[in-house]
């Protein structure tokens, strides 16, 4: 099967049954830890993943058997990915005891996940479509961007049905869409998905007030994204330059853990990007620390270890290993480019 530069087709179905699950598990652990039942592993396991790049998003249709899926804090620390994921099922389904607005996906419903947060779910035998959405594409459109992990979206909402139909159409036409089309479509898709998520709460006085603050929050997120690397960034300076009171700044960032934690998390996210970059001469931890706004490599290493339970050096080594294992094909010529795409979105 000939593949374009924006399509990756991965399958284990051509392998002996005894090897299929291990090869699949080794590949998909670039994003999830998976397990299945011994009988399935021994007798009936199969898996294919057909992925397309569309602008900055990845669209992947996967067909496989019953499995248990987990994204642990260790996995999050190891891979540094913070994308959003949206799932639609052609057949089969997914359940989770940790779901919001439900524990099981409805026919034509959707499941939204945040890769920066832990996840546990179970799928039946399934055929699904997954959109991997880079955080910057969607985050500023959401009222509460950290509050939707494992949110089940009901097809009773007409906007959910519209988004589901658009997902099917985009996947069906991905190979024919031009770059300029992709840019327009991904932004339209993000707007429609944000409308679904922002209306998922139901109206209360609390959520109405939060929605009234969305423009201010968008301004705050943009400001911190542009200024987090300044070592002299303080709540007082940020409030003054944003033109809001310090108490208002603290209030709006309370759900993000406060001003200092929000700033630290942005710095650590940028540090992960720098540590993931492959160069002939890796940058020193001191240089990475200063570029990200930390006062010293000591404070950087301490913050990284406290947050991710590993050192920046350990993270960089894990990233180098992951990239070597996803360089385009495995030892048998299997197409694993989708793994690299996940790390580089």
List where the protein language model places each region:
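DNA-recognition helix of C2H2 zinc fingers
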Residues: 301
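Glycine- and acidic-residue-biased ligand/ion/polar-headgroup-sensing regions
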Residues: 55-57, 64-70, 74-95
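Alpha-helical bundle regulatory/interaction domains
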Residues: 1-48, 57, 93-246, 253-260, ...
């Amino acid at each position: 099967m000939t593949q374009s530069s924006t399509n990756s087709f991965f399958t284990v179905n051509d392998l002996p049954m005894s090897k299929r699950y291990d090869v699949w598990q080794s590949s998909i652990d670039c994003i999830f830890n998976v397990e299945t039942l011994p009988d399935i592993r021994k007798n009936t396991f199969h898996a294919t993943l057909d992925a397309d790049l569309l602008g900055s998003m990845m669209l992947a249709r996967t067909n496989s058997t019953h499995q248990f899926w987990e994204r642990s804090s260790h996995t999050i620390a190891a891979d540094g990915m913070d994308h959003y994921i949206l799932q639609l099922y052609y057949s089969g389904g997914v359940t989770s005891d940790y779901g919001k607005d439900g524990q099981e996906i409805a026919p034509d419903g959707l499941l939204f996940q945040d890769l920066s947060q832990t996840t546990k779910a179970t799928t039946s035998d399934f055929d699904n479509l997954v959109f991997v959405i880079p955080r910057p594409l969607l985050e500023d459109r959401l009222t509460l961007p950290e509050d939707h992990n494992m949110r089940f979206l009901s097809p009773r909402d007409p906007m959910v049905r519209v988004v589901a139909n658009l997902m099917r159409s985009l996947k069906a036409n991905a190979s024919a869409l031009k770059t300029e089309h992709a840019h327009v479509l991904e932004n339209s898709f993000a707007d429609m998905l944000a409308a679904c998520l922002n209306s998922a709460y139901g109206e209360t006085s609390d959520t109405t007030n939060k929605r009234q603050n969305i423009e201010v929050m968008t301004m705050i997120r943009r400001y911190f994204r542009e200024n987090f690397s300044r070592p002299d960034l303080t709540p007082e300076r940020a409030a003054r330059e944003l033109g809001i009171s310090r108490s208002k700044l603290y209030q709006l960032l309370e759900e993000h853990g406060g001003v200092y934690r929000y700033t630290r998390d942005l710095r650590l996210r940028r540090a992960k990007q720098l540590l993931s970059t492959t160069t002939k001469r890796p940058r020193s931890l001191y240089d990475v620390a200063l570029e990200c706004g930390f006062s010293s490599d000591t404070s950087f290493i301490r913050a990284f270890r406290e947050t991710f339970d590993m050192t920046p050096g350990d993270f960089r080594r894990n990233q180098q290993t992951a990239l070597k294992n996803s360089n385009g094909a495995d030892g048998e010529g299997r197409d694993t480019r989708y793994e690299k795409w996940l790390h580089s979105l």
